[in-house]
Amino acid sequence: MQEESANDMECEQLPAEILRQVTVHRDPIYGFGFVAGSERPVVVRSVRPGGPSENKLLAGDQIVAINEEDVSEAPRERLIELIRSAKEFIVLTVLHTHQSPKSAFISAAKKAKLRSNPVKVRFSEQVAVGETDAKMMKKEALLLIPNVLKVFLENGQIKSFTFDGRTTVKDVMLTLQDRLSLRFIEHFALVLEYAGPEQNHKFLLLQDKQPLAYVVQRTHYHGMKCLFRISFFPKDPVELLRRDPAAFEYLYIQSRNDVIRERFGMDPKPEMLLGLAALHIYITVSATRPSQKISLKNVEKEWGLEPFLPPSLLQVIKEKNLRKSLSQQLKAHQTHPSCGTKGSAIQAKLQYLRILNELPTFTGVLFNTVGLDEKQSATTLLVGPRHGISHVIDLKTNLTTVLSEFSKISKIQLFRENQGVARVETSIMDAKPLVLLMEWPEATNFACLIAGYCRLLLDSRKMVFSRPASQPLPPPMIKADYMHSAHRPVTGGHLGKKESSYVGSVGTSPRKSSRCTPPPADSELVSFCYLHMREQRKEQESRTDVNENLIFFEETRPRTKSDPTSKSSGQGYEVVPDDFDAASLDHEPCASRARSYTLDNSLGAEALNFYCDSCKAKLQEQLGPRKGGKPGSSRDNIVDLMSLPPPGSEEEEEEEDETTSLLPAIAAPPPGFRDNSSDEDDPKRRAVQSQEQGRHLRGLLYDEIPVTLIDSVQTRTVRDHAQELDDALVSTLQALEALAASEDGPHPPPPQTAGLIVLATITPESSLDSGHETNSSELTDMSEMMSAMKQHQNTTYFLAQHLNKDSLLARKDLPFRIQSCAAQAVLTAPYSLGRPDPNPSLQPIATGQSPGPPGARRKLPQSEGQVQGERTYSLAVHPALSPQLSEQKNLSLLSPVPEDKGPGHTRAGLEMSLRAATSSLSEEQVSELRDNLPKEVRLSPKLILDPKSSVTPAIISAALQQVVHNKSLVTAGGALGNPPSRGERRLEASMGRPEVSMMSSSASKNLKFKISPSAPETSWNSQHQLGAEVSSSPRAPTGSRADSLHLSQQEDSLPVQNFPPKSYLLRTSRESVGKQATGEVAGKGGPVGGKPTLQKQGTISSQGEKAQLESTPKRSKLEETSLVPRATYPMALQSPSCQSRSHSPSCQPHGHSPSSQSRGQSPSCQPRGQSPLRSQAASRQVSTMPSRKLETTLNGAHSTSEGPAKPKSSRGPFRLRNLFSATFPTRQKKETDERQAQLQKVKQYELEFLEELLKPPSQGELPGTEYLQPPAPGRCSCQLRSSPVQQGPGMSREQRRSCDCKRICRGGRPQATQTPVPSLRGRERDRVLPSQRQPEAGPGVSLSSPINVQRIRSTSLESRECRSDPESGVSCLTTCASGGECLGAPNYRKLMRRYSISELDQGDRASLTSDVYPHPPLGMLPREAKEVEASLPIALGPKSRSLESPTLGDPSYVQVAPETKGPRQMAVFSLPEEVYRKPAELDEDSESSKCCSIRYCFYYRKCDMADDASDGKDELSYSIPMKILPGMKLDEQVVPVVSRTLQVLDAATCSSSSPEASRTQEIDLRVSTFEGSLAKINALRAHAYGLPDGFLAARLDTNELLTVLRQCVASPEARAPKPYVSQISEYKLELALKFKELRASCRRVANVDKSPTHMLAAITGSFQVLSSLIETFVRLVFIVRSEAQRQELLAKVEEVVRNYTFLLRAAEESTARNLNQQQQQQQQQQQQQQQQQQQQQQQQQQQVAAAAGAATEHPPGSPTSATVMSTFTHSLKTLIK
């Protein structure tokens, strides 16, 4: 008999040339029911539908025998005679010959059937898509194009199907059945293939009734394939051969592929694989060369052996033995044992399948249960046709126990037990139900498999898999959810679909959910939300929770905004019940969502975080009137942007419209592209398509096109936010307002939070979107997000999820991208966003409005409304900061504010008061202020409200928020372009006071008191003047501007959202103070003049909020284009910091005295850092920092006026990343408590280590104790000591650690020892007063002192002394500035570089100069350095200023802040302890510290780097003093690189806490390949390190290794089949040896001579060992099968690499210290010769050394190396274990 062709299946044919016997009974009507042709042999032309031959004979069958009589050569007449002679039945032996693909399967009857009942799926191979990729079909993806599903057949074909919302899995299977002429489709199923953790391949069964839209929705279609497989096997292959030869042939091909691709759960024996390979060769050659003798040599020549053998077999068996065995078996097959003839191909295939059938895992599927405890341990179950449900005792010996047969199963139900775990209850007749706990993906597959076997073996209509009625209804759909479910028919799903669809979809029809379809407008909203949320979805994907981890496909699938948890997918498929739909329709027309079940009940609250309240409100508003209308199917609305609007019924068309709106333009296929059956839908679809295209374009703009914020939109959003405080979501406007307000008001979160919210509201959407509608919707989205946050009290999570830091705000292409630092700061707001405003009644006051309904606010002019919105925000934000200030100073300040009803008056009064206070303040007063400040600080941390005082912390907070908000509003809306409107001014004024008070609690106290009297007028004037001054005379008003800048910066930083007003107030107050102090009036420029300056400068602080407000739109645009991206978002969120920062650079200007600079910078930096960080820390830090800033601002104003200030574009104080970092919660969501504790320990370790490194060799080298302690006016002795450099008198590390001040700082404003601070401040102020710059610095120190305390507390590494000057955060601020950059979007960092690039560079240089450079490269003379040390106030000149300011602001800046007090001021390095603490704590601890904190910076840096590598290089994230080694030249380029490296390294440490970072890594690291990784490692290993940049290179290379680590684990190759399993043990052993070797090499590094050459040689050797270790790790990762094991290995190795980075730092610092000591000895000798001059130089050098090489001052035997080594050794030991 003729053998079948090898290519039969390849041509989409059922097996050809297969003989089969068919018994056909004569029918009285149809006879035998087929028409035969006249060919010889006779061919069946057609089969009569409904006749007896249907499903027995096929068109094209050759009749070979009739009743066992051969008629192949008989004449036609004989054939007819035989047929007629058969009376009742006839037995035909027919041969199905190979025919053309088309004619073989479409008979006339079938065509008629198709016409009458067309299938809902059409093949679309001929469809031409624009610019299609020739390889598109072969790519392993679920979708070919948006609504075209690719199905991979086992015969090598790829079929593509267009689908709409009605198309189900069953439709696709029926179409394939027709195409492949399959009889029993019950054996088949569509499955999704993905790489499982333990197995190379896992298949997720799709239920028949599952709509394809859900499948696509719930699947990450980039990483999965849809396969058409036989999933329900026959008990014996012979049965299938008899019943359905085509299915038998398909089973053979599938099994053959499984063997070659090693898809089995267990490894078959090599002998079995050899036998199967021989059969495979025999079958293939027999089919293609029927008459040829089969020899192995011929096979090798023609095909080679690879196509027939699994890869692992080639490695396990020697080639010689393999050939020998194959040859023997081929000979045996060619000689039949019984008759000696050659066996047929059919027999060989049957034998092939029977051999496989003996493997339990071939026909059966293994399921692992979840063990709860020792009593109930995990078990393994086997489900298969021959095993039923069996318990596996020993898989190797096939020892199993049957638990139940399929015939006894009556019902299967799934219940959600807990996250990711389902309880499977299988009801068994006459026995107790079988209750199992499984992970959701396993559980759904388990239930589907059993249900399929019951249908196959028992009753095809039997449904055993059902969802329990008792199961809770899915949570009501939230807007985001709704958006996804309803609007993204194609896209929303994740692989979880398998679980969810299986679980819920069996009994219900997906259409129910479709009844409530939002109108197309909604879809627009949704599209916006979708765009907004898509980033979040991606981040969530990368961030896997328990459920997600379980569902790998889900993990990969793009997350829908509405579907935060893929795990819920288990239920997700189920449709909402009718009653539920009705209820949901009442509340929210679109509330019902088919996917609602995908949300875990436990996750419901969390899910809310993903919904945009504004969008929800908008939807409600739009849908409300239409409630009566015909509901559309929301189910189909869930479409990805990439998905096409599926053709559908009228019911679905409405949804589709919405859906299509979300789809890209490409989504809409041309009219002929779709299914024929859907042609009637084309007209409507076309309309939808046009909308869809628009939406898509909008989405593209949002995602890819930098767009400036739209003023009107932003303004509207802010105003809406404010309004929302009072109103629930009712109308679109109300919803928007409510969202904003709820974000602000409901959660009187720290100002940062409010600022963050505003930013989120404005930036993500408005900036991205090009249309006002979209913007508003986007803003609404943000508002909704905020509302959700409010509801769930999880700001961090909300922000992180909703505004994907990386995705949206930090994206390179996002002009207004915000840095993570800012985001963290915002998120870490002391108060949760959801928290109600402490004193709602005060809000109106702060707002400048009488409390009234939101409507009243709405009525206000835009600017006023904005102001009000900002005010509201300020209230929300300010509470954290203002409590102390407001309580202490704001009371007086605010009380006047209410009195000053004129908006301008309040603010003006504030400014005036500040100015007057500043100018009039005596040193004693300053001291008093400083003294008071600590108290305020203490209060602020707690946000104390004074019931008696009209101004409460809440009011202050509100004021700050409002200010920020106003600024943001102003920034957002150009409407505020004019000087702030009365409302605005009033807001600013009223707010300004609180803000000022908050900003500098101590300073503001006095200032406020004094300001109150004259606040109204002065405030008003100074506002205008300030604005003018800032813009018109950056230099002249520099002092005043700097002052106001500082204030505003702080304010800005605190209430980022309220930024503009707050900044303005601060600036105004500063200006007033500065003007009075300086005698300069800011009036020169005029508010309008100031605006342009602000825009250009990118600094909005001095000019005033209005300038910023006015210029914000422009500026935001500018920023968008350039640095503004950050600024844009910051403008609202960041603008305060930007403004303050810019002003700080421009006003505060680097030119100011060092103190002023540092302070100015601090303010600017701090504001930046603060705003993001302050949101959290603001509450406690704000008062400390603010008060200091106020003083600083006041003094600074003088100094500023003295020296010109360079306007510099300031960086947004907030960076979403920072905010996120600040919002540790996001991290926490990913981390277990244990992990967090470990992180804390690691950070503390690092901190202590760095601290030790930074410790001076001896106290003698340290500045005087007075210098050390007094330096920080608000510092606690512990804090003073905390700075390694200023370790003079002090406390032990333990004492410092336990010091209350730290707690205070963390909790709220640090209560640094106030007494010392006042004295310090007094001194500083005295110094500052003598020279305006100095005064500024002094006040800055004083004001910053509390902040410093915070920072100090937060960073023991940071030199408190230096910081005291810039307490606002000279070093921290600088870092902050850098942190601000960090906070700002990575772009911001780039753009901002926050000063002009030159300035930034200078800043870097300056920081290096002070910290790192023995000689300030900036041209800072030793004298200047000294002056800076002595009193930052000393004017270094504009250049110095800018340098210094930038230094302070520069993220990369290593700040060496000399204490103004000590004659030999020590340079202080800001190394935040916070780094070691959790981000939230850090943020709270110190605004500047946050920025400076290693951890924060790293966080930010890391994000930044992920966003923009070049940006990351620009800044030093790790503020560590570096001593320049001989021959080493550090310039502004190198410093940022080093900084970035440090940040990256530390970021790695924080990566677990930075969802953004991890997500970014996942995205960036997925391209790694095995060979590429090894090549990279080998290239790095070849590096040798020497002077001058060896340490830097080593760090960079170590960072590269970290990248390689993550890339490997994230690489798809790592999850591909692992053939080298046998080598795992070898690699593991090798890895352990490498760990030991590394430990030894690291010890050598610690013990080597501290000379640079020897140290670098030791480091080179240790790095080579580390590279070898990483190489071994990579090799191991690529062969380890378990994802869990890979992650565990990664964690261990990562820990070692991170510790190694600390060792490098310690080595560098130790070496630098050694050199520094030598230099110091020489200097001492020179000092003897020239005591005075050399003393000064030594001070300068010491400062530089301290800042840049503080670590270098420790003796070689310092505990640094020991500490590092102990940590390192400990980690290595752990790893080796």
Swiss-Prot record:
Q: Which InterPro entries match?
A: Band_41_domain (IPR019749), FAK1-like_FERM_C (IPR049385), FERM/acyl-CoA-bd_prot_sf (IPR014352), FERM_2 (IPR035963), FERM_central (IPR019748), FERM_domain (IPR000299), FRMPD1/3/4_FERM_C (IPR041779), PDZ (IPR001478)
Question: Which parts of this chain are annotated as the region Disordered?
Answer: 491-520, 555-574, 622-697, 832-871, 1014-1216, 1309-1346, 1732-1765
Domain FERM as annotated: residue spans: 147-461
User: Compositional bias (Polar residues) at which positions?
Assistant: 502-511, 840-850, 1015-1035, 1046-1056, 1094-1111, 1172-1202
Q: Which GO terms describe its cellular component?
A: cytoskeleton; plasma membrane; secretory granule membrane; tertiary granule membrane
> Which stretches make up the PDZ domain?
21-98
List the biased-composition ranges (Low complexity): 1134-1168, 1732-1751
Listed PANTHER family: FERM AND PDZ DOMAIN-CONTAINING PROTEIN 3, FERM AND PDZ DOMAIN-CONTAINING PROTEIN FAMILY MEMBER
Identification of the protein by name: FERM and PDZ domain-containing protein 3
